[in-house]
Design a protein with these regions (language model features):
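Primary recognition of RNase H-like, Mg2+-dependent phosphodiesterase/nuclease domains
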Residues: 1-130
Length: 130
């Protein structure tokens, strides 16, 4: 599954990442997915989602919501760190999201992904750079 959408009224990049993950978890839950892998280029977000301590920072409410969604709705989940240079698909989806006119225009792809990202995935699998 891939998704792109415009988020508004954000305070920082970590909050944007957390909101995107929370929205993705809600979609995956509604689709009945029991096993997921989240990939992020934000090490702080990965740590926040997986550590036992409660986060009392500016993004605490969003972190708690994402954790709750993970713990209650998925039998198996992994949160993986992927360095930004290796995460070209996320970069393309972010560019697509920025081009959307409003937050009501979110796009979700279950299997037939847009060409702009499917070419990147194909080249990554082949070990090439597009």
């Amino acid at each position: 599954m891939m998704a792109a959408g415009k988020l508004q009224n954000l305070q920082d990049p970590v909050q944007a990442e957390l909101m995107a993950v929370t929205n993705a978890l809600k979609i995956a839950t509604n689709l009945g997915m029991g096993k997921i892998i989240l990939e992020t280029d934000c090490q702080n977000m990965k740590t926040s989602l997986l550590e036992e301590e409660m986060d009392n920072g500016i993004n605490a409410v969003v972190v708690r919501e994402a954790r709750m969604l993970l713990f209650l709705n998925f039998d198996v989940y992994h949160v993986m760190y992927c360095p930004r240079v290796c995460n070209r698909v996320a970069h393309q989806l972010a560019q697509l999201s920025a081009s959307l006119e409003s937050s009501d225009n979110a796009c979700v792809w279950l299997d037939d992904f847009p060409r702009l990202v499917s070419d990147i995935v194909t080249s990554d699998c082949a070990g090439l750079v597009v």
